């Protein structure tokens, strides 16, 4: 379980988050909703460790991770897909997926079949450059890359923004599948 308790986050003198609480249970989908500029992305950046908080606590599976760097949080099973997807445009789909190997033990360095079951288009495009994919295909690639790490918590920022409806349905089905399997 993820527990965010009374966190504050500042960018210089500007306060982005004030007293935020959030809990997310295993096997559940938790959504953070709000208009532009209210701190949704800042909250996600704090959860994954990209932005330090000035007050409060972030716990994952009963462990205080507030001061852990992002790579340690990733090792604990937290994966993040940012709003801009941040795929590598000059690398192939295969190479993009393999960038997730960096934090894995040698025996775990493979792309799980589940990635291609959820997003079959990726298998068909393994040799294509990431930058040649549509926005929706890039989002599928970003989610697939995160799934290579076999996360227990998947943090998605605006996962369907600017994507065609058919791919939104594919992403929704993938999220439902991951929820039902419990992580």
Language-model region placement:
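ABC ATPase signature
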Residues: 91, 133, 146-147
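Conserved ABC transporter NBD signature motif
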Residues: 56-63, 76, 108-111, 117
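A short, proline-enriched helix->beta-strand linker immediately N-terminal to the Walker B motif
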Residues: 148-152
């Amino acid at each position: 379980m993820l527990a965010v308790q009374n966190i504050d986050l500042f960018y210089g003198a500007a306060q982005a988050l004030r007293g935020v609480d959030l809990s997310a249970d295993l096997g559940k989908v938790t959504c953070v909703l709000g208009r532009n500029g209210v701190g949704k992305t800042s909250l996600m950046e704090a959860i994954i460790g990209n932005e330090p908080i000035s007050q409060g606590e972030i716990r994952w599976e009963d462990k205080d991770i507030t001061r852990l760097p992002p790579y340690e949080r990733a090792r604990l099973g937290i994966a993040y897909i940012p709003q801009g997807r941040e795929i590598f445009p000059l690398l192939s789909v295969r190479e993009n997926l393999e960038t997730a190997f960096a934090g894995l033990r040698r025996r775990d360095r493979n792309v799980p079949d589940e990635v291609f079951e959820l997003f079959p288009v990726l298998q068909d495009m393994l040799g294509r450059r990431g930058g040649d994919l549509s926005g929706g295909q890039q989002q599928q690639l970003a989610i697939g890359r995160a799934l290579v790490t076999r996360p227990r918590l998947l943090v998605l920022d605006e996962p369907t923004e600017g994507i065609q409806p058919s791919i939104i349905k594919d992403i929704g089905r993938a999220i439902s599948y991951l929820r039902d399997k419990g992580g």
